[in-house]
């Protein structure tokens, strides 16, 4: 059997893509440095993005120890932050709002040539101690799970280069659900936006929230456009109109929880208009 370059592994409702070094394409010394010295097939990166799956850059010998990562992702179904693409050498910081509804938060950093990865509490202290599970034995992946995280702005700090993904997922009552798209008049809703025309987007935020706003963001989590939300039928249900460009995008919603603290939820899949 040929050694696979990529293995796709389904875990419950989520799809996780494990990127492996391929013997048929890499010299022995290159393979030993996988993934930094290897080549990741971009199609598998696209699969992870298009399905909202989790991209793990793992060396072949790390697969046996990856089960806790896969199970942890499945137990944290709501996405708070997601960025994927390539990063340049140097230190990068990402600020993540954690609201009072978050029972458990999963912070994941995957960088092809990972150098450093840190998670900083709102107080400025590095994350350690009780209620923290840290998976830091992988070459290109760092995952930290924090039970009952304090509210406020957390900071993910990473350095390295190459293909990268920074994802924050949570177990929480506040969720972005029912996200659908339709060309006008907005009656035939589907999971995929229609290219070349104005779309009606329909969404609902589940949970006790207020001051809900929404925006279209890129795969690199850059704001593309603000959505002008109009209340729809149902609690915290909204519709808006926008004309998608050719590139992929996500929908991000923000607002405040019952205590007035800011929350953020993001659609995990990267939508590509068709």
Language-model-detected regions and their locations in the chain:
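VWA/integrin I-like adhesion module and closely mimicked acidic/polar interface patches used
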Residues: 1-2, 8-10, 16-58, 64-69
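C-terminal "exit" segments of structured domains
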Residues: 49-51, 56-141, 146-147, 153-159, ...
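Generic structural detector for well-ordered beta-strands
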Residues: 95-97, 145-146, 228, 239-243, ...
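Edge beta-strands of extracellular beta-sandwich domains
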Residues: 164-172, 259-273
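Extracellular/periplasmic ectodomains of large secreted or surface enzymes and adhesion receptors
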Residues: 177-190, 272-274
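Conserved, compact domain cores that house catalytic/ligand-binding motifs in diverse enzymes
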Residues: 187-263
């Amino acid at each position: 059997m040929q050694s696979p370059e990529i293995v796709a592994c389904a875990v419950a409702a989520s799809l996780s893509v494990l990127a492996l070094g391929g013997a048929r394409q890499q010299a022995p010394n290159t393979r030993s440095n996988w993934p930094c010295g290897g080549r990741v097939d971009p199609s598998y990166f696209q699969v992870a993005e298009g399905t909202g799956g989790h991209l793990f850059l793992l060396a072949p010998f790390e697969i046996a120890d990856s089960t806790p990562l896969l199970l942890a992702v499945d137990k944290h179904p709501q996405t708070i932050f997601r960025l994927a693409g390539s990063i340049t050498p140097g230190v990068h910081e990402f600020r993540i709002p954690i609201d009072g509804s978050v029972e458990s938060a999963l912070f994941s950093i995957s960088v092809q040539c990972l150098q450093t990865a840190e998670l900083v509490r709102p107080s400025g202290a590095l994350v350690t101690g009780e209620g923290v599970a840290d998976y830091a034995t992988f070459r290109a992946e760092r995952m930290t799970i924090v039970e009952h995280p304090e509210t406020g702005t957390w900071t993910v700090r990473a350095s390295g280069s190459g293909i990268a993904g920074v994802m924050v997922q949570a177990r929480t009552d506040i969720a972005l659900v029912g996200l659908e798209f339709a060309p006008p008049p907005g009656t035939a809703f589907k999971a995929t936006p229609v290219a070349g025309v104005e779309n009606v987007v329909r969404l609902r935020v589940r949970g006790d929230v207020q001051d809900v706003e929404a925006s279209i963001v890129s795969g690199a989590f850059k704001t593309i456009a603000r959505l002008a939300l109009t209340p729809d039928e149902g609690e915290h249900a909204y519709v808006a109109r926008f004309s998608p460009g050719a590139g992929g995008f996500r929908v991000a919603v923000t607002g405040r929880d019952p205590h007035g603290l800011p929350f953020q939820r993001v659609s995990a899949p990267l939508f590509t208009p068709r």
